[in-house]
Amino acid sequence: MEALAELGDVNTLTAEFEAAPGTPGDINGVVNGASGSIAPGETGMGSFTPINPANYQYFSFASMVIPSNDAFIGNDNAMEYQIFDDNGNFLGNNGVFEIQVSSIYDAGTEINDSSVNGGAAFIAGADGNGGATENGVVSLATDLSEFQGVDTPSGLTINDTTLGAGESFATIRIIEIPAV
């Protein structure tokens, strides 16, 4: 999770999922926005073909939260998001998942620091590799105010870093596309 949380690098996490026992033929992929990262209000899309939906009924995800040193979202319960029933039928409207701001995690790997040399990724002019080690543990993020007013490389200024309970952070929508 460290590479994902700090730099948005999915390669290590993907390799770990592929090497896990009992998951032959699993489905994984990356969903990007127009510029790689998904900006506020933007949509990212991906297309995946289930190998055996009766055996692979659940959806798992993880994503870096930017800008940050090591904030991320992801489900901590592998059976939290069911998208197929026991017979492999798509569950339709159950394929919409709202991720709340209160579900943002801090990986505990780097101290939050929005300065140019602070190691936060996706801040204009900053080196995403230079963060100070925190030696913490994964916990719910309680504060991202360090990033209030910073600019991203795409020119977006972060104006709201409030982590209010009940606020939506992301929507994941899974739809079934009929076979042609």
Residue ranges of predicted features:
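A broadly tuned preference for mixed-charge, low-complexity surface segments
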Residues: 1-24, 108-138
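Glutamate identity and glutamate-enriched acidic tracts
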Residues: 2, 6, 16-18, 42, ...
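Intrinsically disordered, low-complexity, compositionally biased regions/tails
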Residues: 29, 33, 92, 99, ...
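A structural detector for beta-sheet-dominated domains
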Residues: 49-51, 84, 100-102, 141, ...
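Short loop/turn segments at secondary-structure transitions that flank enzyme active sites
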Residues: 65-69, 105, 178
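An exposed acidic His-Trp-rich patch
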Residues: 70-127
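Long, compositionally biased interface segments
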Residues: 130-180
